[in-house]
Curated annotation (Swiss-Prot):
Protein name: Major DNA-binding protein
Family listed: Belongs to the herpesviridae major DNA-binding protein family.
Biased composition (Basic and acidic residues): 1174-1196
Source species of the chain: Human herpesvirus 1 (strain KOS) (HHV-1)
Superkingdom assignment: Viruses
Length: 1196
């Protein structure tokens, strides 16, 4: 496998401080918008907000910077001083440490700080405790306001800091350069800005963390230097401790959170650090091993090596250390993407008032709630993968044989309260007697404490997490009996509630109540086997290889080695370009909208009769046939492309960026991205641990320090080997830029000096850039040299991919969506006897069962039936896509892919297909959905919720999430969405004798099924991705939103549809009514679309619901609903006195000599058998012969 050579790119960045404190009067306009985007708990005056140009930073804000991180002695006598600079970029979050109370809290949930403190103690993580001496030197927000002339009661102060030095601020290793403050303009308001510099500036050649920053007599302070007052603000330090360091500590399994902060800060200051950064006295979680193996974490009779769990604990801490070092490298990266600018947001275009803009932002954030819910409720989510398990050596007889998969991440959320053990496996004092929960089979409930741990015990992030969970569906349309919040709150006044966070008046918004409402979706950890990681990421490129056949016949495969062609010429002959031409031509015909593949174009005005249907289908077929023929001719004759081999190598592929500014403008979404990246880094590091351990004395006290650099180097060597692509940058200072810094002798209130000299310490660095995710198009059997286990796994998959021989129902075939949508126009007389409503289910069911009276069919009807049947049968004969088209876009792309598969002699197995589940939002569908936002609680809860619903437009945050599925991913990916998907990273060596470790990021599944996302379906032939579009939100225009649905109800309804029959609509309605009862009336058209993926049936359901309400005089009655359904069923079941019936089974049979139905005078081609040419041209001919010599298309 060849990789691209690493090329260095020179990029110039301006010098600057490591951060700024922004101080401003609380803005009168836009504060509601800022509150929506921020994370704040109601019991704290602090918040975390996104870095947004025009909202929190000024226009022209420079995100990349060469940070002044220290000083060096220069000159012959070492008397001169120059500055040391390190590249970095500003964090995508800003930290409000004074005036946060002016921002509305993210949730009304009470006492989240108390919950986080309790959870922190319960799981053994350290709390933030400033030293007593530090408190004497605090720089308060009030003092800063007084100095800047701001009213402390109306001021807003927040820290904007570079990514690599957040921890340095947290441990008081910085100071405010008060003399360097200036003013900028944000949103038309004047804002003060105070630069923040590191204390190491006053300690030449000191590249470490300062343990005692308030010691003004430190021996490393330069001679005659005026040491400044370190910047210590208790609310800010606690906020950084909880929101920045806490999540990293949870992900890296380090209970000493302060040690994580110091380790990260040290890596930022010391560019030459190689050894271990995490402390030697780190503790580990004791848990019982999965699958009957020996206990991990605890002692097992004093055994050493793998049997005693020692290597598992060693791999755990070393992988965490390597991940922290890798995150430090990424924090020093320089990115191309500028920070998001609120004035350029498409969702705010045309919104003239602040309230309208806030409403638009609230609707968008509700979209993201679907992705947040998936990350919380998926059992293989990166949020839960916090422990390391040991599968044992690959060869029990030879422990030195390396294995990439020996150590792996497992869900640890439910075992976090287990006893803590030390390096040797002894239980740490204070944890004796604690029960040990098993990795698998535990009975623990997912509780508020677990949710707090997922957020790093940060009340602000926990509040934002609840903001999203309050907008998630807990089962209101899924057949589950979702909790009635009104009744629960009312009953709780007379019963004991196991919650000490809320009172009767605040119970409706309590974290416990929200989790109770979502209880049916809680993660259930039933497996601890090695598997995929559920990751949150962002597509930052409009390009992806997500067409039906992926990157088949791609540019790189067609490019000639001599470079004699232009890129444009090559691109015109790719499969991708062919699909674009097909879609463009269909868009010209007004059949499709390329930007919204699920849209029906203008078909409603085009298909007004049966002739128009013929025209549409024939046009689609001819356009595709022409492009496929031209494509294959170019590939075979023009380029001698190995088109069959190319199909076997084709992949669906996309890239997830590591650029922090590409993520959504929300601190919690940024947390999900960070935790996902840390899980990926640890997965890569764990794969190399066994190779580092092999043949070494791992019990040695100095082993970690000695071999941590080896592990780190091995992980770095995995860059650009198939999965984690990196970019090598040479960083230089901007031309002509003066290095301004505080005077080292005049004090921190003196103006900045610009006479300093300095240079960049890290000149050339390789920065990870993106993660490459792919999925093979074809189902590939096990190779000849595969292991027996691999062959067994492949054998178990074959049945899932095997194409069945059964004939597919016409309505479930390629034209089913058109036949249902336009049945009245195609067959106006296709209605049950006694009914005035044309019914496609009744018509096609009676037709295919040979029960339709022949007298009901005209000659034109019969011609159309012949046309539809022939196309459906011929399409089915070559179809290897396990999905029926839902629109013309899918019909064209599926038909095109199947034609190419036919050319390539593909047979037997379905191919892998992709489905995007697009997150959408809507206003609350019921009063219950708005309960958590009610201004009144207790006895007035229902009245408060109804009042909110009556004036819902006045509440910008009153939106809930919904979903829609789309099987054509390229336009979805072109919207550069935030995504959630499963990722399984394969590792393997290259050619024989090559020790390079290559990787493949395989597109996998989220575990947890419909708990993770209601539209997830267990189908091995399909790969799913949850997507929340960013670029203009173009996919939302399809309006195909959907509510959630549960496995039992979903599969039941889909089963009814797949069985067919005349009474499909009434059967679906009856099943839904019996499952949901009165909640059926709450289902909107988008909910039915999500449940059924059938627009015609969805409209039928809405009509039946309306008739049921009308029958009940406006009130819902289950009896009335069932009565309406049975009447509809009776109507379509009537066939009357049929007389002679139309024999659909024999019609269009394969006997070439059969006389067409209707007698000898009937037109021949329309009624010919399957083997007869259709209009003189059979588009479904035989496959290509074996290759003999040079191929031409005519030979195919």
């Amino acid at each position: 496998m060849e990789t691209k050579p690493k090329t260095a790119t020179t990029i110039k960045v301006p010098p600057g401080p490591l951060g700024y404190v922004y101080a401003r009067a609380c803005p009168s306009e836009g504060i509601e918008l800022l509150a929506l985007l921020s994370a704040r708990s109601g019991d704290a005056d602090v918040a975390v907000a996104p870095l947004v140009v025009g909202l929190t930073v000024e226009s022209g804000f420079e995100a990349n910077v060469a940070v002044v991180v220290g000083s060096r002695t220069t000159g012959l006598g070492g008397t001169a001083v120059s500055l040391k600079l390190t590249p970095s970029h500003y964090s995508s979050s800003v930290y409000v440490f004074h005036g946060g109370r002016h921002l509305d809290p993210s949730t009304q949930a009470p006492n989240l700080t108390r919950l986080c403190e309790r959870a922190r103690r319960h799981f053994g993580f350290s709390d933030y405790t400033p030293r007593p001496g530090d408190l004497k030197h605090e720089t308060t927000g009030e003092a800063l306001c007084e100095r800047l002339g701001l009213d402390p009661d109306r001021a807003l102060l927040y820290l904007v800091v570079t990514e690599g030095f957040k921890e340095a601020v947290c441990i008081n290793n910085t100071f405010l350069h008060l003399g360097g403050s200036d003013k900028v303009t944000i949103g038309g308001a004047e804002v003060h800005r105070i630069p923040v510099y590191p204390l190491q500036l006053f300690m030449p050649d000191f590249s470490r963390v300062i343990a005692e920053p308030f010691n003004a007599n430190h021996r490393s302070i330069g001679e005659n230097f005026t040491y400044p007052l370190p910047f210590f603000n208790r609310p800010l330090n606690r906020l950084l401790f909880e929101a920045v360091v806490g999540p990293a500590a949870v992900a890296l399994r380090c209970r000493n959170v302060d040690a994580v902060a110091r380790a990260a800060a040290h890596l930022a200051f010391d560019e030459n650090h190689e050894g271990a950064a995490l402390p030697a006295d780190i503790t580990f979680t004791a848990f019982e091993a999965s699958q009957g193996k020996t206990p991990r974490g605890g002692r097992d009779g004093g055994g050493k090596g793998p049997a005693g769990g020692f290597e598992q604990r060693l791999a755990s801490v070393m992988a965490g250390d390597a991940a922290l070092a890798l995150e430090s490298i990424v924090s020093m990266a320089v990115f191309d993407e500028p920070p998001t600018d609120i004035s350029a947001w498409p969702l705010c275009e045309g919104q003239d008032t602040a309230a309208a803009r806030a409403n638009a932002v609230g609707a968008y954030l509700a979209r993201a709630a679907g992705l947040v819910g998936a990350m919380v409720f998926s059992t293989n989510s990166a949020l839960h993968l916090t422990e390391v398990d040991d599968a044992g050596p690959a060869d029990p007889k030879d422990h030195s044989k390396p294995s990439f998969y020996r150590f792996f991440l497992v869900p640890g959320t439910h075992v976090a309260a287990n006893p803590q053990v030390d390096r040797e496996g002894h239980v740490v004092p204070g944890f004796e007697g604690r029960p040990t929960a098993p990795l698998v089979g535990g009975t623990q409930e997912f509780a508020g404490e677990h949710l707090a741990m997922l957020c790093g015990f940060s009340p602000a992030l926990l509040a934002k997490m609840l903001f999203y969970l309050e907008r998630c569906d807990g089962g209101v349309i899924v057949g589950r009996q979702e909790m009635d919040v009104f009744r629960y709150v009312a009953d709780s006044n007379q019963t004991d509630v196991p919650c000490n966070l809320c009172t009767f008046d605040t119970r409706h918004a309590c974290v416990h109540t929200t989790l109770m409402r979502l209880r049916a979706r809680h993660p259930k950890f039933a497996s601890a086997a090695r598997g995929a990681i559920g990751v949150f990421g962002t597509m930052n490129s409009m390009y992806s290889d997500c067409d039906v056949l992926g990157n088949y016949a791609a540019f790189s495969a067609l490019k000639r080695a001599d470079g004699s062609e232009t890129a444009r010429t090559i691109m015109q002959e790719t499969y991708r370009a062919a699909t674009e031409r097909v879609m463009a031509e269909l868009e010209t015909l007004q059949y499709v909208d390329q930007a919204v593949p699920t849209a029906m174009g203008r078909l409603e005005t085009i298909i007004t009769n049966r002739e128009a249907l013929h025209t549409v289908v024939n046009n689609v077929r001819q356009v595709v046939d022409r492009e496929v023929e031209q494509l294959m001719r170019n590939l075979v004759e023009g380029r001698n492309f190995k088109f069959r081999d190319g199909l076997g190598e084709a992949n669906h592929a996309m890239s997830l960026t590591l650029d922090p500014y590409a993520c959504g403008p929300c601190p919690l979404l940024q947390l999900l991205g960070r935790r996902s990246n840390l899980a990926v880094y640890q997965d890569l590091a764990l794969s190399q641990c066994h190779g580092v351990f092999a043949g070494q004395s791992v019990e040695g006290r100095n082993f970690r320090n000695q071999f941590q650099p080896v592990l780190r180097r091995r992980v770095m060597d995995m860059f650009n080997n198939g999965f984690l692509s990196a970019k090598t940058l040479t960083v230089a200072l901007s031309e002509g830029a003066a290095i301004c810094a505080p005077s080292l002798t005049a004090g921190q209130t003196a103006p900045a000096e610009s006479s300093f000299e300095g240079d960049v310490a890290r000149v050339t660095l390789g920065f990870p850039k993106e993660l490459r995710v792919k999925s093979r198009v074809l189902f590939a059997g096990a190779s000849a040299n595969a292991s027996e286990a691999a062959k067994a796994r492949v054998a178990s998959l074959q049945s899932a991919y095997q194409k069945p021989d059964k004939r597919v129902d016409i309505l479930l075939g390629p034209l089913g969506f058109l036949l249902k949508q336009f049945h009245a126009a195609i067959f106006p007389n296709g209605k049950p006897p006694g009914s005035n409503q044309p019914n496609p289910q009744w018509f096609w069911t009676a037709l295919q069962r040979n029960q339709l009276p022949a007298r009901l069919l005209s000659r034109e009807d019969i011609e159309t039936i012949a046309f539809i049947k022939k196309f459906s049968l011929d399409y089915g004969a070559i179809n290897f896509i396990n999905l029926a088209p839902n629109n013309v876009s899918e019909l064209a792309m599926y038909y095109m892919a199947n034609q190419i598969l036919r050319y390539c002699d593909h047979s037997t197995y379905f191919i892998n297909t992709l489905t995007a589940i697009i997150a959408g939002s809507r206003r609350p569908p019921s009063v219950q959905a708005a309960a958590a936002w009610s201004a009144q609680g207790g006895a007035g809860l229902e009245a408060g919720a109804r009042a909110l619903m009556d004036a819902v437009d006045a509440h910008p945050g009153a939106w809930t999430s919904m979903f829609a599925s789309c099987n054509l991913l390229r336009p979805v990916m072109a919207a550069r969405p935030m995504v959630v998907l499963g990722l399984s990273i394969s590792k393997y060596y290259g050619m024989a004798g090559n020790d390079r470790v290559f990787q493949a990021g395989n597109w996998a599944s989220l575990m947890g099924g419909k708990n993770a996302c209601p539209l997830l379906i267990f189908d091995r032939t399909r790969k799913f991705v949850l997507a929340c579009p960013r670029a203009g939100f173009v996919c939302a225009a399809s309006n195909l939103g959907g509510g959630a649905h549960e496995s039992s109800l979903c599969e039941q309804l889909r089963g009814i549809i797949s069985e067919g029959g005349a009474a499909v609509a009434s059967s679906v309605f009856v099943a839904t009514v019996k499952s949901l009862g009165p909640r059926t009336q709450q289902l909107q058209i988008e909910d039915w679309l999500a449940l059924l993926e059938d627009e015609y049936l969805s409209e039928e359901m809405m009509e039946l619901t309306a008739r049921a309400l009308e029958r009940g005089n406006g009130e819902w009655s289950t009896d009335a609903a069932l009565e309406v359904a049975h009447e509809a069923e009776a109507l379509v079941s009537q066939l009357g006195n049929a007389g002679e019936v139309f024999n659909f089974g024999d019609f269009g049979c394969e006997d070439d000599n059969a006389t067409p139905f209707g007698g000898p005078g009937a037109p021949g081609p329309a009624f010919a058998g399957r083997k007869r040419a259709f209009h003189g041209d059979d588009p479904f001919g035989e496959g290509p012969p074996d290759k003999k010599g040079d191929l031409t298309l005519d030979m195919l």
